[in-house]
């Protein structure tokens, strides 16, 4: 029995270590097993974003503007003074900086349920402590870019109750014979923003510009509870390579691996629960770039060439900008593969069906907490035959534990004879000491997947359960669920045979305390899942053990 228990604890410990190490590497931190080489802060702005040299004049003309923070360069100040234009819709409050017509602040608005504060979250921001921007401009000459001050076109800045769309337009100064009119279109109930760039050639010669669309962000986490970390950083999606995550650490070391040109897909910045993504028109060729532009500032973007524009003519480049929560069903309807920004890691193949099932149950019961309870119950029912096999093996081992202890005491000075005697006992009683391991091991990927489902699902944010639980994404405010978790673990240890080794027995008694401390900081939805799982496991074990005990008693009586 102690061998099987040791194997299970080793499996559990290694799973926990590997999950933690995977989280470390996903956030650009050093791996415990693979030391990082010395990081560099070089990110040449003379490159074209995919590692090619910008030595030629054409490449220099297409080099991205080098203002690292999104503010104006520290050189000659422009004649016009930039200002922030505030706007509001039913889902956004935000600010557009007239310097570049940049989307400099974007707050996703959502009201609370009266028992907690509003659930609004600021996605884009530009402060001394945090930078996250969406910006565009022109390349290919001395054309308007995100450093130039635009003029706001007169018009409403709030979505009226009787309107479905709000348009905000900004005009650039004339540079290189080109004027740009940038228009943001906000739609009621939508987290997709239309961004139209109208390029007017007001000069005397044809121009061939390129439009760049980029997301600029620092590497700081925002609104990330303890032990609730998921991927943070840029991502690229194309039909060729599908979803490619890029860690800030890989960018630091110039090891970022991604598709550098395509005519489909999107680029994104991903964080816990929320994401932003530029989605150019499908079929339009574009170059993709990911760069470090400051010690803590990064950008991911696309450069889309525009056909030659004759004097007096204009060209329009349309794109969509998603900025919102990582709700799978909504993301699936916006762009192919966009739902992948909701990151389940290496268990995606199992996690996605589990979330689908959780979502269906929620649609039936209308409460995410009860949906977690019912899904856990359903999973335990599916795995009942495997659990029964494990508990039966444990029960049989419990029956022969006194005889095992006697053999250990008898042959304690001769380990070889002791092992031979134990093997003979197992053979005589037809007991496999590892018989309970395999059923448990098979279930581990499912339980890890459900962990990631609950961790990554923005639906848990602000979702109440009962009584004191008003937000399943936050820790239990009164620590009731962690205490119940500790109690359930303690009961489980009592149901199992006491290990013959006193040190191991003390460890088994200590584990509930150690794990309960860790669970004090877990989101309530995760702890609820573990509590329900433990309670159901206790009920299963008690039922199976009692059934076997009754059968054994009848056999002896006969």
Swiss-Prot record:
It is a multi-pass membrane protein. The keyword Transmembrane applies. Signal peptide: none annotated. Interacts with the Sec translocase complex via SecD. Specifically interacts with transmembrane segments of nascent integral membrane proteins during membrane integration. Pfam families: 60KD_IMP, YidC_periplas. The chain crosses the membrane at residues 3-23, 364-384, 438-458, 477-497, 508-528. The gene is yidC. GO terms for molecular function: membrane insertase activity. InterPro entries: Membr_insert_YidC, Membr_insert_YidC_N, YidC/ALB3/OXA1/COX18, YidC/Oxa/ALB_C, YidC_ALB_C, YidC_periplasmic_sf. It comes from Burkholderia pseudomallei (strain K96243). This is Membrane protein insertase YidC.
């Amino acid at each position: 029995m102690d061998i099987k228990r040791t194997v299970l604890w080793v499996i559990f410990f290694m799973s926990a270590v590997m999950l933690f190490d995977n989280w470390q590497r996903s956030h650009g931190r050093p791996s415990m097993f693979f030391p990082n080489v010395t990081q560099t802060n070089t990110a040449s702005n003379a490159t074209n974003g995919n590692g090619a040299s910008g030595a030629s004049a054409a490449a220099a003309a297409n080099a991205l503007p080098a203002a690292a923070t999104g503010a104006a360069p520290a050189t000659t100040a422009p004649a016009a003074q930039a200002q922030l234009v505030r706007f509001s819709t039913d889902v956004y409050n935000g600010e557009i900086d007239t310097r570049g017509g940049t989307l400099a602040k974007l707050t996703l608005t959502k009201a609370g349920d009266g028992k907690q504060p509003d659930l609004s979250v600021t996605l884009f921001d530009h402060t001394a402590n945090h930078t996250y921007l969406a910006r565009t401009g022109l390349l290919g000459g001395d054309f308007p870019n995100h450093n130039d001050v635009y003029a706001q076109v007169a018009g409403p800045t709030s979505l009226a109750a009787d309107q479905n769309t709000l348009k905000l337009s900004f005009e650039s100064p004339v540079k290189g014979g080109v004027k740009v009119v940038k228009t943001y279109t906000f739609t009621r109930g939508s987290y997709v923003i239309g961004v139209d760039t109208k390029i007017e050639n007001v000069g005397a010669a044809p121009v061939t510009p390129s439009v760049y669309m980029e997301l600029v962000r620092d590497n700081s986490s925002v609104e990330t509870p303890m032990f609730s970390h998921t991927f943070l950083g840029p991502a690229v999606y194309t039909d060729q390579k599908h979803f490619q995550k890029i860690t800030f650490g890989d960018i630091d070391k110039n090891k970022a691996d991604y598709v550098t040109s395509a005519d489909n897909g999107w680029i994104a910045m991903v964080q816990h629960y929320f994401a932003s993504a530029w989605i150019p028109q499908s079929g339009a060729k574009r170059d993709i770039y990911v760069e470090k532009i400051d010690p803590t500032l990064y950008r991911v973007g696309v450069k889309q060439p525009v056909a030659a524009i004759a004097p007096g003519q204009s060209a329009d480049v349309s794109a969509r900008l998603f900025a919102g929560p990582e709700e799978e069903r909504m993301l699936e309807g916006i762009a192919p593969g966009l739902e992948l920004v909701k990151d389940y890691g290496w268990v995606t193949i199992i996690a996605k069906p589990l979330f689908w099932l959780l979502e269906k149950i929620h649609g039936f019961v209308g409460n995410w907490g009860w949906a977690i309870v019912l899904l856990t119950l359903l999973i335990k029912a599916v795995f009942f035959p495997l659990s029964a096999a494990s508990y039966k093996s444990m029960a049989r081992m419990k029956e022969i534990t006194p005889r095992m202890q006697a053999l250990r005491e008898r042959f304690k000075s001769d380990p070889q004879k002791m092992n031979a005697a134990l093997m003979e006992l197992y053979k005589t009683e037809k007991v496999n000491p590892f018989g309970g391991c395999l059923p448990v091991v098979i279930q581990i990927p499912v339980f890890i997947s459900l962990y990631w489902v609950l961790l990554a699902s923005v639906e848990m944010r602000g979702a109440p359960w009962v009584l004191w639980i008003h937000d399943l994404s936050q820790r239990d405010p009164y620590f009731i669920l962690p205490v119940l978790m500790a109690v359930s673990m303690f009961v489980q240890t009592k149901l199992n045979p006491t290990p013959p080794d006193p040190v191991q027995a003390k460890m088994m008694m200590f584990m509930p305390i150690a794990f309960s401390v860790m669970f004090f900081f877990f989101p309530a939805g995760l702890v609820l899942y573990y509590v329900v799982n433990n309670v159901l496991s206790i009920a299963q074990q008690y039922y199976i053990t009692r059934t076997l005990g009754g059968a054994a008693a009848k056999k002896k009586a006969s």
